[in-house]
Amino acid sequence: MSESTATPVEITTRPEPGRILLKAPRRGKPPKHLADFDLAGRKEFLTELGHPGFRASQLSTHYFDHLTTDPQRMTDLPAATREEMVAAAMPQLLTEVRTLEADGGDTIKSVYRLFDGALVESVLMRYEHRVTMCISSQAGCGMNCPFCATGQAGLTRNLSTAEIVEQVVAGARRLKSMQGLEQAEHGTEATRPLRVSNIVFMGMGEALANYKAAIGAI
């Protein structure tokens, strides 16, 4: 695999041998994000931020369909308030710090730093007839499986719903970018899937130990 730069962060909350850790350590919570809520919750969230609730549908279209958080591209929002609205409703949750590529670029692992310095991983896998995303539900893991490096490292904290969703959105953005580059290089229309078709919770963490956030992301 080829790789870019990395800044590792140690995860130190590790269960005793033979024990599992189901309750995540107490840590600060990430900022609230549009993706933490269902549509009704997003409308309430926007209202609390001082904006009309109907803006939630517009922001949802930009984020989930257009995969953008760039306020300059959101021309259906008021120019005077769109930057402040986007910054408050869709704060940056993930910062990519490392990538690993295999299979000629068809498999890409991304390592992201969260707001508190914790690290999580996701993997984008492209096949002829599908695109699969492997995502994390926790930073670290408390299951303490002896065969798993993540489990042996310990559990830092649960991810929020939006932090889980953001991994998929980031993967979808990367897929879209890769397809554009391939089309420009070869001058042909894409022949492989254009969207993420499968999502598996097989990254870091045990999704059932972070049930509420995992279900919210689904």
Predicted regions located by residue number:
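Conserved Radical SAM active-site core
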Residues: V120, M125-S136, G142-I218
